Amino acid sequence: MKLRLEGYKDALNEAGIPYDEALIENARSFSIKSGYQAFQELNQRCGGRFTAVFAIADTLAIGCLRAAKESGYQLPEDLSVMGFDGIEFGAYYSPSLTTVRQPYEYMAEQAIFMMRGLLDNEDNRHMVLNAEIVERESCAKRGE
C-alpha cells in the first residue's frame, strides 16, 4: 500500500496540488464496511474540503460510494470516487465504479517466474506493472 500512497503523492505533485495529510483516512481493513466507515470519518473531519476520493481498493471505494450517497452527496456531480483493483462488482454498482484495473493474469505469470527464480537461488526482483484506468460513472470533471 506504500507504493499506492507514493503514487498518489506523485500525481498530486504533477498536478500542482499540495499534499494534505488531513485528507488521508486509513481504513481498518479492505472490506466494504471499512470503506463506509472511513468515508464517514473523513467526511466528519473534512466535509466540504474535498471533491474526490481515491480508495486503495475497489471494496473500500464501494463503501465510500454508499456512505457518500447516504450523506447527501450527488455522485459524481458533488463527489467523484475512484477505486483500485478492477473487481467485477464495481461495474454493476450504482454509480458504476471508476477504477484502476491491474493486469492480474500477467501478475500471476510473473509471480510464478519469480518464485521459480527464488527456488533456483536467483536474486529477488521488484516489478512495477502498467495498470489501466477504467472510466465509469463514479467520476466526473467538476462542472459536468
Task: Kindly give the residue locations of the regions a language model identified.
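Bacterial carbohydrate/catabolite-sensing allosteric modules
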Residues: 1-144
